[in-house]
Amino acid sequence: MNKLTIATRKSKLAQTQTEIIMKSLKDKFNIDSEKMLIVTEGDRKLDVSLAKIGGKGLFVKDIEIALLEKRADGAVHSMKDVPYELSHEFEIAAITEREDIRDVLISKDNIPFKELRKGAIIGTSSIRRACQLKLMRNDLDIVPIRGNVQTRLEKMKEQNLDGIILASAGLKRLNEEDIITEYFDPKVFIPAVAQGALGIECLKTSSAKKYFEKMEDSNAKLTVEAERSFMRMLNGDCHSLIGAYSEIQGNDLYMIGIYDIGGRIVKKDILGDKNDHIELGRKLANKILEI
């Protein structure tokens, strides 16, 4: 096969994540590939919250156009940015091995979360993160902060914030985990649905699909599909406070989810056969809605 073209966002993290997939293509199949860098609408509108401009799907749409026009053979996404409903022409051919799922605190002077000063100013534009922070410490002042990892770190200094919340996965992929002050327990501070997972999207008719499919990680697929099933049942998006964490426990799958029902934050968990992972996601959603 000739060289593949892999579409991705322009940020350093997006490119690093794409390079992980490109290396795997080379190592497994001896296939060369190149990046196609795309500035998405979500990247262009950094001064407005995602909830106000249409949600995380804005990071995907422009890339899908490149796939549809066959300018790219595949695309690498952070699965937490991928809407649960894809247009019928596309599919997620593979979910690769998942990175650390946890959220982390990066604080000024490396001060642990519990020791942050009263009224400490913390940057995050995530409704999920902001609400969980307030549940843990109601005194905190939460301010919006968007942009890639580097931009947020710069804004933290410029705006003299006491800290920011980021996903561990991105920092680890960028080899910047040394700046992490503290990791949050994912069963206490629930991550975003599919956090830490990369997905390879392509046209259903793509000749490259057979290679992408062989890059799938079975445990990542189970946990991500379970969490996305939970999200789909609740019709969750970035307008919603929604999060989920799941892990394989032998033949079982354990999942805990969080959701906002009329201003009340509900957290529930479930354990069941991992082969019923899609149904477990639905059951957990129903369990939350029964409250």
Swiss-Prot record:
Segments crossing the lipid bilayer: none
Domain of life where this protein originates: Bacteria
Cofactor(s) essential for the protein: dipyrromethane
Keywords annotated in UniProt: Porphyrin biosynthesis, Transferase
Cofactor binding: number and manner: Binds 1 dipyrromethane group covalently.
GO biological process: protoporphyrinogen IX biosynthetic process
GO cellular component, one term: cytoplasm
InterPro entries listed in its UniProt record: HemC (IPR000860), Porphobilin_deaminase_cofac_BS (IPR022419), Porphobilin_deaminase_N (IPR022417), Porphobilinogen_deaminase_C (IPR022418), Porphobilinogen_deaminase_C_sf (IPR036803)
Pathway: Porphyrin-containing compound metabolism; protoporphyrin-IX biosynthesis; coproporphyrinogen-III from 5-aminolevulinate: step 2/4
EC number: 2.5.1.61
Residue list for modification S-(dipyrrolylmethanemethyl)cysteine: C238
Catalytic reaction list: 4 porphobilinogen + H2O = hydroxymethylbilane + 4 NH4(+)
MF terms (GO), sorted A to Z: hydroxymethylbilane synthase activity
Annotated function: Tetrapolymerization of the monopyrrole PBG into the hydroxymethylbilane pre-uroporphyrinogen in several discrete steps.
Subunit record text: Monomer.
Family, per entry: Belongs to the HMBS family.
NCBIfam families on file: hemC
Leftover remarks: The porphobilinogen subunits are added to the dipyrromethane group.
Name of the protein in question: Porphobilinogen deaminase
Species this chain originates from: Clostridium beijerinckii (strain ATCC 51743 / NCIMB 8052)
Gene that specifies this protein: hemC
